[in-house]
């Protein structure tokens, strides 16, 4: 890894340093008080989705709360500087707009022009630290799964990472069951630590509960082949 002047959250940087990364220069630091300010919101999303899994009458609510949870990230990552002001103008008005430093683009529809302009003022009131933290914590979790689980418990000849997204990983395994690929000398440790990575399987209730627990890896799809871009790792 090599980078210059990047914004990186301390938990992710700490993990990188533990792996051997050397930080040669720090340009600035933003100090904040550590707290779980969105804990209740996260628990609400998970619990409502669990209710939808258990009782069909709550299924619609579970799907809606999923959308709310996902949009909380998407909304806070919005770059309002890219927003345009749209107006519909006559040819004479259009000619004036073309000379404006705020002009961006235009389309003609009959005798009317649809003109796109930059806004004179942009109110940057999005909580971008939330979306930034979401991305960096997601990256940290994916790296932990690869380096602290896959590379640790499974021989590299028995799997191949094919594709990775923000919160998902697609891999080819030499067996239908991960348990069959665990290194012999680490099977006991795997049994102790597997609940840190996957939903519990001791009871149906625990499995259903853990399937909606953030940070655990669940099977979304299985198949015999896949065409994919290189993994984002």
Model-assigned labels for residue ranges:
Residues 1-233:
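Conserved acidic
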């Amino acid at each position: 890894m090599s980078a210059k002047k990047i914004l990186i959250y301390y938990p992710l940087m700490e993990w990188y340093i533990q792996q051997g990364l050397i930080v040669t220069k720090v340009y600035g630091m933003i100090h904040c008080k550590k707290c779980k300010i969105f804990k209740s919101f996260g628990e609400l999303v998970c619990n409502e989705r669990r209710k939808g899994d258990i009782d069909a009458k709550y299924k619609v609510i579970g799907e809606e709360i999923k959308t709310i949870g996902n949009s909380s990230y998407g909304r806070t990552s919005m770059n309002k500087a890219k927003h345009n002001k749209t107006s519909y103008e006559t040819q004479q008005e259009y000619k004036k707009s073309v000379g404006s430093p705020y002009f961006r683009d235009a389309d003609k529809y009959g005798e009317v022009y649809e003109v796109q302009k930059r806004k004179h003022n942009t109110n940057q009131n999005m909580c971008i630290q939330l979306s930034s933290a979401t991305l960096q914590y997601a990256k940290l979790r994916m790296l932990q799964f690869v380096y602290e689980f896959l590379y640790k418990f499974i021989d590299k000849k028995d799997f191949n990472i094919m594709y990775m997204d923000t919160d998902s990983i697609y891999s080819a395994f030499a067996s239908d069951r991960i348990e069959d690929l665990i290194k012999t000398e680490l099977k006991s440790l795997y049994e102790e630590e597997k609940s840190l990575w996957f939903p519990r399987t001791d009871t149906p209730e625990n499995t259903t509960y853990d399937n909606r627990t953030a940070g655990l890896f669940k099977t979304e799809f299985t198949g015999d082949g896949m065409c994919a871009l290189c993994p984002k790792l």
